[in-house]
From Swiss-Prot:
Active-site residue list: 183
Free-text function comment from the UniProt entry: Ribosome-inactivating protein of type 1, inhibits protein synthesis in animal cells.
PANTHER family: PTHR33453, RIBOSOME-INACTIVATING PROTEIN (PTHR33453:SF34)
Lineage: Eukaryota, Viridiplantae, Streptophyta, Embryophyta, Tracheophyta
EC number: 3.2.2.22
Protein name as catalogued: Ribosome-inactivating protein bryodin II
Length: 282
């Protein structure tokens, strides 16, 4: 496996025209690192149509209602099995998925999600929520740092969700899909790491995991920095690939340039008060 440094970023953002009335689709059949990147970039584009940018980073919507609150993503594995995953457009959370004539909703999915998504088929409420702590517990008390990622693991996750195998396989599948779809949409580094593992597997490194944990704080401080000449009100602690602490203190950091989506925060002009307009991150 080729090692990628923590500060590796993809400088080039390629936007693609995405029709607003269709799902985003990704099939592993014939997939390459390039087609995976195109899928992730199309998803980012769809999630941020008409939204502002802060330091040239697209900001997610601060609110949405009804079906507009959710983006559907259809994933197909190497065996041709497909599931359709529903993402919350405000924070890129996975809230539910459909396999055949059954839709499965995470325990913390909203009533609105249950009311508007996957109408006309059987709905099942899962006994665990969509945050990492709950999923890791349901997956057999395994930390996501010990769960391998890569195209083969995405394929297996889709298959387990499609068949909804009992036990720990589905919550483990959620952990794989969340990191390779939602987290990859948020961070170019995560997108890059996944795209490199078409025929191989890898376990998330400390940098990979610390970015996931700090997305909310990074989004907050980047938006506060607009009122502070680019400086953060509080440093954000991350980890390098070798697990050394490192701190991000302003928008000139290469870490900031590697962020692809920001969670929306409303900043009180003239103060450092910030009001989160969505749920906390995974």
């Amino acid at each position: 496996m080729r090692s990628i440094g923590f500060y590796s970023v993809l400088a080039l953002y390629v936007g693609a025209h995405v029709t607003e009335d269709v799902d985003i689709n990704f099939s592993l059949i014939g997939a390459t690192g390039a087609t995976y990147k195109t899928f992730i970039r199309n998803l980012r584009t769809k999630l941020t149509v008409g939204t502002p940018r802060v330091y040239d980073i697209p900001v997610l919507r601060n609110a949405a209602a009804g079906l507009a609150r959710f983006q559907l993503v259809t994933l197909t594995n190497y065996n041709g099995e497909s599931v359709t995953v529903a993402l919350d457009v405000v924070n890129v959370y996975v809230v539910a998925y459909r396999a055949g004539n059954t839709a499965y909703f995470l325990a913390d999915a909203s009533t609105e999600a249950n009311n508007v998504l996957f109408a006309g088929i059987n709905h099942v409420r899962l006994p665990y929520g969509g945050n990492y702590d709950g999923l890791e517990t349901a997956a057999g008390r395994i930390s996501r740092e010990n769960i391998e990622l890569g195209f083969s693991e995405i394929s297996s996750a889709i298959g387990n969700m499609f068949r909804h195998n009992p036990g720990t396989s589905v919550p483990r599948a959620f952990i794989v899909i969340i990191q390779t779809v939602s987290e990859a949409a948020r961070f170019k580094y995560i997108e890059q790491r996944v795209s490199e593992n078409v025929g191989t597997k890898f376990k998330p490194d400390p940098a990979f995991l610390s970015l996931q944990n700090a997305w909310g704080s990074l989004s907050e401080q980047i938006q506060i920095a607009q009122t502070r000449g680019g400086e953060f009100a509080r440093p954000v602690e991350l980890r390098t690939v070798s697990n050394t602490p490192t701190f991000v203190t302003n928008v000139n950091s290469p870490v900031v340039k590697g962020i692809a989506l920001l969670l929306y925060f409303r900043v009180n002009v003239g103060t450092d008060n910030v009001f989160a307009m969505s749920l906390s991150t995974y």
